[in-house]
């Protein structure tokens, strides 16, 4: 089952930004319980040039269904607001 998601932001604090950890909101997932079922699944982002960057969902973020995904390499800023595929 493949799910689409939107890249919301980098994982960050007031002074630090973790470029290889992204906050992703899967579409049609609205609770922490539903999001926890996605932990361990693969996340794919396709760049405009066709390169595919892979990540893995590592934990839930908040109570509205967002998740954190750790990528092998950090995603570029142009990925913000773009769609990813959760496999």
From Swiss-Prot:
Key word Oxidoreductase present: no
Annotated Gene3D superfamilies: translation elongation factor selb, chain A, domain 4
Subunit structure: Part of the 50S ribosomal subunit.
Alphabetical UniProt keywords: Ribonucleoprotein, Ribosomal protein
Family membership noted in the UniProt record: Belongs to the eukaryotic ribosomal protein eL33 family.
Gene Ontology BP term (one): translation
GO terms for MF: structural constituent of ribosome
GO annotations of cellular component type: ribonucleoprotein complex; ribosome
Organism name: Pyrococcus furiosus (strain ATCC 43587 / DSM 3638 / JCM 8422 / Vc1)
Protein name: Large ribosomal subunit protein eL33
């Amino acid at each position: 089952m493949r799910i689409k998601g939107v890249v919301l932001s980098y994982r960050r604090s007031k002074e630090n930004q973790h470029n290889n950890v992204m906050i992703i909101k899967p579409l049609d997932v609205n609770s922490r319980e539903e999001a926890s079922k996605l932990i361990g699944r693969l996340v794919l982002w396709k760049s405009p040039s066709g390169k595919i960057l892979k990540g893995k969902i590592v934990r839930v973020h908040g109570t509205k269904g967002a998740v954190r995904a750790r990528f092998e390499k950090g995603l570029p800023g142009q990925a913000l607001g773009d769609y990813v595929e959760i496999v």
